[in-house]
């Protein structure tokens, strides 16, 4: 985007991902704690109400998203945005935006990721399971957090909620004007917050900012 505001999200790399091909990749499924059998099971038959009631889990959530018959394509935008470090000094952080390739965007989901063990698992470096929500019309905003992505050389402030929440919200504030300038405006103004484990704590902290 020409003449982008300095505070906007800046794209470093972009690619289009075939979701159907992605969920049929055993290596990718393993990263999500899944297997090809999970995909085959969902495609073979609808999950019964009884299963639905007894399977409220991450795997059930994944099975709902792994219906390959309804998969389309997603656009992945990895980029950087301005935030602050632990001392309040300006810093560039990284993250990823995942949006439907062709369908209109319903609304944003701001995702705070769970605890990860290495930079290889940072959202900028993988396709997060939550990204499959694009098939339902959502655009995902997923920060790497300080200490991951382009700041992997720094110590991650694990469970220092105020700074992590600030970093997460700063990415949202940077992405929204970027998307508007690109002509990608959601149908609804309200956003969903999403997080699991460390991401759950971060999501609650974001609500207090």
Segments from the language model and where they lie:
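Second-shell loop/turn segments in exported
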Residues: 129, 153-161
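Residue in the alpha/beta-hydrolase core beta-strand immediately N-terminal to the catalytic nucleophile
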Residues: 190-192
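Secondary-structure boundary elements
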Residues: 102, 137, 173-185
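Gly/Ala-rich beta-loop-alpha elbow adjacent to hydrolase catalytic centers
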Residues: 195-199, 203
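Short, surface-exposed "cap/lid" segments of acyl-processing enzymes
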Residues: 85-137, 144, 148-151
């Amino acid at each position: 985007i020409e003449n982008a505001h300095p505070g906007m999200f800046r794209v470093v790399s972009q690619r289009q991902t075939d979701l159907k091909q992605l969920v049929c990749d055993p290596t990718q499924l393993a990263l999500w704690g899944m297997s090809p059998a999970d995909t085959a099971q969902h495609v073979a038959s609808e999950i019964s109400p009884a299963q639905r009631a007894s399977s409220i889990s991450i795997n059930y959530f994944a099975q709902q998203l792994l219906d390959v018959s309804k998969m389309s394509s997603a656009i992945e935008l990895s980029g950087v945005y301005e935030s602050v470090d632990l001392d309040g000094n300006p810093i560039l952080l990284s993250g990823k935006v995942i949006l439907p390739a062709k369908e209109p965007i319903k609304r944003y989901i701001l995702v705070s990721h769970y605890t990860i063990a290495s930079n290889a698992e940072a959202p900028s470096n993988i396709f997060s399971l939550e990204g499959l929500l694009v098939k339902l019309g959502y655009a995902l905003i997923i920060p790497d957090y300080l200490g991951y992505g382009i700041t992997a050389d720094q110590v991650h402030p694990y469970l220092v909620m105020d700074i992590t929440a600030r970093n997460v919200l700063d990415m949202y504030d940077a992405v929204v004007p970027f998307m508007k300038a690109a002509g990608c405006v959601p149908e609804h103004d309200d956003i969903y917050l999403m997080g699991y484990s460390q991401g759950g704590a971060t999501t609650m902290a974001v609500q207090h900012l």
